[in-house]
Amino acid sequence: MNLNATILGQAIAFVLFVLFCMKYVWPPIMAAIEKRQKEIADGLSSAERAKKDLDLAKADAGEQLAKAKAEAQAIIESANKQRTQMIEEAKAEAEQERSKIVAQAQSELEAERKRAREELRKQVAMLAIAGAEKIIERSVDEAANSDIVDKLVAEL
């Protein structure tokens, strides 16, 4: 055989092989490659969407945390105001109670003073009556009478 015929035979066999591969082997390989490219592209887009969703979730979580902190601060401030108000009310109530007790003590003291004065008046009246009885019993001169009156005044 000659070298040209061998090369020609090999060239024909190669062309037939290439045609066979293009017709039966190449389309499934290309379909698999395209399918894989599509899966990779879908995976990348899913990853990108997931990243965006994660960023949105982080932002939302940050907003919710800030809102919760603000609400907690408002609750704390409200509780402090309520506590202060309750303390002030308790102080006012205690002051009223103290004033009431002081007023009651003063009225009791005044009543005791009046009772003591009344008792003293009764004693003075008794002394005056006793002194008058002594003066009447002792008919003495005017100097003795004046002396007895001075003693009564000193006793009062």
Curated annotation (Swiss-Prot):
Superkingdom field: Bacteria
InterPro entries tied to this protein: ATP_synth_B-like_membr_sf, ATP_synth_b/b'su_bac/chlpt, ATP_synth_F0_bsu_bac, ATP_synthase_B_chain
Stretches that traverse the bilayer: 11-31
One protein family per Pfam: ATP-synt_B
Localization: Cell inner membrane
Gene Ontology MF terms: proton-transporting ATP synthase activity, rotational mechanism; proton-transporting ATPase activity, rotational mechanism
Keywords recorded for this protein, A-Z: ATP synthesis, Cell inner membrane, Cell membrane, CF(0), Hydrogen ion transport, Ion transport, Membrane, Transmembrane, Transmembrane helix, Transport
One GO CC term on file: plasma membrane
Annotated membrane topology: Single-pass membrane protein
Record's function text: F(1)F(0) ATP synthase produces ATP from ADP in the presence of a proton or sodium gradient. F-type ATPases consist of two structural domains, F(1) containing the extramembraneous catalytic core and F(0) containing the membrane proton channel, linked together by a central stalk and a peripheral stalk. During catalysis, ATP synthesis in the catalytic domain of F(1) is coupled via a rotary mechanism of the central stalk subunits to proton translocation. Component of the F(0) channel, it forms part of the peripheral stalk, linking F(1) to F(0).
Family according to the record: Belongs to the ATPase B chain family.
Classification via HAMAP family: ATP_synth_b_bprime
Assembly and oligomerization: F-type ATPases have 2 components, F(1) - the catalytic core - and F(0) - the membrane proton channel. F(1) has five subunits: alpha(3), beta(3), gamma(1), delta(1), epsilon(1). F(0) has three main subunits: a(1), b(2) and c(10-14). The alpha and beta chains form an alternating ring which encloses part of the gamma chain. F(1) is attached to F(0) by a central stalk formed by the gamma and epsilon chains, while a peripheral stalk is formed by the delta and b chains.
PANTHER family listed in its UniProt record: ATP SYNTHASE SUBUNIT B, ATP SYNTHASE SUBUNIT B', CHLOROPLASTIC
Protein name, UniProt field: ATP synthase subunit b
Native source organism of the sequence: Proteus mirabilis (strain HI4320)
Organism phylogeny: Bacteria, Pseudomonadati, Pseudomonadota, Gammaproteobacteria, Enterobacterales
